[in-house]
Amino acid sequence: MYSMQRVYDYQGQQPAILTDRLWPRGVRKNKLNGVQWCKTISPSTSLRQWFHQDRQQRYSEFCRRYRLELQQPEQLQQLENIRQLHHQYGQLLLLTASKDIAHSHVPILLAALQH
């Protein structure tokens, strides 16, 4: 089972990966000891910056563009690596610093992992 959670709420009890390209502000590295940082699976810098200019109006297009990015060879390999971690642990928590997880890249990533 995959789950999503804000990194700020993570207590360190479940296997987890950090899905953000940027390290979460105010989080010490030792708080995420044992958590893999999979920054290459996150949206590209240009896509992230474009999306953040108008999140409400651009979310649908952001989803479409991010799905295309996830089809690139490096991202496909990273998806497979994450699936292997999930298989190894039986569960995996997808962590993000996003305040609005439902309208972030994480649900798109989750759908790609379950595909």
PLM regions and their residue ranges:
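Residues lining hydrophobic/aromatic ligand-binding pockets adjacent to catalytic sites
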Residues: M1-H115
